[in-house]
């Protein structure tokens, strides 16, 4: 019998750096408030670009050592976020970065895009069985922006939830990362005519694959107090996010609002009490019995064992 914090949050991301960019503030917020935060990363990000010139030979087309290097970057990012429980799905290196949609790398025999859905989902089910999180975060069906590994992460997470539900320990709520249309429109207006406009060529916010109507947003997590932690986590991924990245350009203009506020749609579960015209939640655990307090909860049946197919810092 192992005791864990009463509030337990599980995130499933495709590559190292996705956790920091998309959910870093949320992770840091819940870790700082005593929740048990677990990150499962599905690949090592072997096909990523290398933005550090002296490390260029690590690229997939050269020495193909980038994945191993990114393990260290991810560990540093987790430290910045205060997250101590990280695992790679199936173990580090089990699934390879598939590269962008339509590339030959999609067909690599270890590409995550080629993974057997039930096998990969079963590996995630073991993590769910061990930790029994109440909340799961992953991407929508388009993987937020269409990357095959993001789409596959969505499929694996949702299949794992289905399998866990059949055994009675599925997370009560499943959220998908999202960006409200109003926030994107405000950004486009702000950067219009700017030399560093990250929305160059976009006429309407709805053209962006991750644009979500405000009324479909379920939760707005204001973790502006953690914006420094999120930026530190992003900077830990130096091979992927150069100092002149448009991400930092937006942050420089919007500051803690950009770095510290993250949005989600609710895919599974009942929405809790919210605020504003659309009733946005300000807590992912809203409406759940563990929404208040930080008591520790016993977790049995496997909590003392290392999860099948999962490795990482604990």
Swiss-Prot record:
Binds 1 zinc ion per subunit. Zn(2+) binds at residues 15, 18, 150. SUPFAM superfamilies: LmbE-like. Residues 291-314 are annotated as: Disordered. It catalyses: 1D-myo-inositol 2-acetamido-2-deoxy-alpha-D-glucopyranoside + H2O = 1D-myo-inositol 2-amino-2-deoxy-alpha-D-glucopyranoside + acetate. InterPro entries: GlcNAc_PI_deacetylase-related, LmbE-like_dom_sf, Mycothiol_biosynthesis_MshB. Pfam families: PIG-L. Gene3D superfamilies: LmbE-like. Its EC number is 3.5.1.103. One of its GO terms (molecular function) is N-acetylglucosaminylinositol deacetylase activity. It comes from the Bacteria. GO terms for biological process: mycothiol biosynthetic process. Its cofactor is Zn(2+). Keywords: Hydrolase, Metal-binding, Zinc. Catalyzes the deacetylation of 1D-myo-inositol 2-acetamido-2-deoxy-alpha-D-glucopyranoside (GlcNAc-Ins) in the mycothiol biosynthesis pathway. Belongs to the MshB deacetylase family. HAMAP family: MshB (MF_01696). This is 1D-myo-inositol 2-acetamido-2-deoxy-alpha-D-glucopyranoside deacetylase.
């Amino acid at each position: 019998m192992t005791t864990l914090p009463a509030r337990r949050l599980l995130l499933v991301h495709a590559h190292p750096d996705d956790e920091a960019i998309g959910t870093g503030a949320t992770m840091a917020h819940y870790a700082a408030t005593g929740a048990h935060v677990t990150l499962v990363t599905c690949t090592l990000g072997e096909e990523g670009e290398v933005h550090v010139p002296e490390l260029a030979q690590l690229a997939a087309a050269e020495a193909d050592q980038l994945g191993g290097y990114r393990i260290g970057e991810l560990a540093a990012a987790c430290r910045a976020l205060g997250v101590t429980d990280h695992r790679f799905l199936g173990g580090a290196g089990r699934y390879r970065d598939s590269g962008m949609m339509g590339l030959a790398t999609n067909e690599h025999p270890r590409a995550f895009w080629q993974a057997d859905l039930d096998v990969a989902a079963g590996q995630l089910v073991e993590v769910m069985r061990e930790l029994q999180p109440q909340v799961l975060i992953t991407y929508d069906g388009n993987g937020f922006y269409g990357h095959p590994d993001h789409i596959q992460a969505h499929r694996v997470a949702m299949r794992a939830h289905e399998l866990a539900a059949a055994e009675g320990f599925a997370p009560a709520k499943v959220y998908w990362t999202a960006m409200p249309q109003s926030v994107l429109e405000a950004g486009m207006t702000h950067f219009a005519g700017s030399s560093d406009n990250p929305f160059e060529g976009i006429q309407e916010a709805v053209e962006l694959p991750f644009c979500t109507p405000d009324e479909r947003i379920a939760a707005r997590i204001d973790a502006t107090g953690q914006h420094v932690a999120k930026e530190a986590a992003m900077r830990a991924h130096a091979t992927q996010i150069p100092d002149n990245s448009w991400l930092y350009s937006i942050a420089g203009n919007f500051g803690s609002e950009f770095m510290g506020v993250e949005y989600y749609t609710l895919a599974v579960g009942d929405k809790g009490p919210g605020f504003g015209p659309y009733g946005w939640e300000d807590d992912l655990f809203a409406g759940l019995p563990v929404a208040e307090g930080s008591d520790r909860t016993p977790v049995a049946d496997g909590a003392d064992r290392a999860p099948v197919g999962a490795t990482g810092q604990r």
